Regions:
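Mature N-terminal, pre-catalytic/accessory segment of carbohydrate-active enzymes
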Residues: 1-49
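Short amphipathic alpha-helical segments that mediate assembly, nucleic-acid/protein binding
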Residues: 6-10, 31, 44, 163, ...
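Intrinsically disordered, low-complexity segments enriched in polar/charged residues with Gly/Pro
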Residues: 9-12, 93, 279, 302-304
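Low-complexity, intrinsically disordered/propeptide-like segments
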Residues: 13, 17, 28, 62-65, ...
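Aromatic-lined, polymer-binding surfaces characteristic
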Residues: 23, 38, 44-50, 55-291
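Carbohydrate-active enzyme catalytic cores, enriched for enzymes
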Residues: 209, 249-346
Length: 346
């Protein structure tokens, strides 16, 4: 029989979608239960530990944080731009992990010290857009991601000026990405940067602000229906045909979007047959303690299943009730019980 996968329309989803905040990382209606449930959770503790480290390390301006030693030696403008993007991404990605930890630490405790450090840090980061050292679409999408998380997570504590700062950045950066996607993305087989990161980030920005800025209604319609019609994979067999190293970069999108859509709609987006097929790809492409199977560029760097891959398999085991993914995780954790903690990232 042909598997049935028929998600609800966006109109039905939005009819039940809450107007309060937070509503993206968690629903405010479940907030106290989530805090209680995670009181002794080691993953929750990891976020709080990372957030505390941020508080003890004040952030400087980008020009003081970035290493331009190699950049200034290059005379070719293309090489300089590439090196600048690479070096600035190191700082911006680090700060995404920091801000995300601060937002989550606040949501897990309601301790306002995490909000204060988070908004101060993010205000500085957003000012980097005027710096000559800031470049690249990944960096810009990361600012959108941080602004969205802070807006939704800290909403009840934000001053009017802070809300406006975040909304202005969400509107401007979000519109930039939306206008790059529309009539382009849906007509291509794949667009790696979009599928890896920026599409997920725009989706969360849309649902964080829908009903509050007019642009978000358009983004929400586009992102929800694009996912249903095109994603998660390029083929139904569950394989990641554009390379295993590229698969790793897509892991957050492949879990976070369907998990979010499932929560707000009541429909199981992991029921898409692609996910159970993909569990087999994860296992066969890189068995426990094995190198990657050699598919695609940069596969040589995948020397053993890392924390991100094992964490992804763990999510599939839970969301799809997949015994093969569960066995894969169990086998690896027998030898490396801390493997999931190594997946800690923004």
């Amino acid at each position: 029989d042909t598997p049935e996968f028929n998600p609800p329309t966006l109109e039905k989803v939005l009819a039940e979608y809450p107007s309060h905040h937070p509503r993206v990382l968690l629903d405010a209606a479940d907030w106290e239960k989530i805090i209680a449930k995670n009181k002794n959770n080691s993953e929750a503790r990891a976020y709080m530990d990372k957030a505390s480290q941020c508080i003890s390390r004040p952030l400087k301006h980008l020009q003081e944080e970035i290493d331009t030693t190699n950049v200034v030696t290059l005379t070719n403008i293309v090489q300089r731009e590439s090196a600048l993007i690479r070096e600035s991404r190191k700082i911006v990605d680090r700060e995404e992990a920091n801000v995300e930890a601060l937002v989550r630490a606040y949501l897990l405790t309601k301790d306002e010290k995490y909000y204060r450090e988070g908004i101060n840090r993010l205000s500085e980061i957003l000012s980097w857009q005027k710096s000559k050292y800031f470049a690249g679409d990944f960096n810009l999408s990361t600012l959108l991601s941080m602004s969205t998380s802070a807006y939704d997570g800290f909403y009840n504590l934000l001053s009017p000026e802070e809300k406006q700062l975040l909304l202005d950045n969400i509107r401007r950066i979000g519109d930039k990405f939306y206008n790059e996607y529309v009539n382009h993305l849906e007509n291509r087989i794949a667009d790696n940067h979009v599928w890896q990161m920026t599409f997920r980030i725009l989706t969360m920005a849309a649902f964080a602000t829908v009903g509050e800025i007019s642009e978000a209604s358009v983004w929400t319609d586009y992102c929800y229906n694009e996912w249903i019609s095109r994603l998660p994979g390029l083929h139904k067999d569950g394989g990641w045909h554009n390379g295993d190293a590229y698969f790793h970069v897509n892991i957050r999108t492949l879990i976070e979007i369907p998990a979010f859509f499932s929560r707000i709609s009541g429909f199981n987006f992991f029921a898409d047959p692609w996910y159970n097929n993909n569990a087999l790809y994860v296992i066969y492409q890189q068995p426990p303690f094995s190198k990657s199977g050699g598919h695609g560029n940069s596969h040589e760097g995948q020397r053993s299943p890392n924390g991100g891959r094992v964490g992804y398999a763990d999510a599939l085991a839970r969301e799809c009730n997949n015994p093969w993914a569960a066995a894969y995780v169990h086998e690896i954790m027998q030898e490396d019980p801390d493997i999931l903690s190594k997946a800690f990232e923004a």
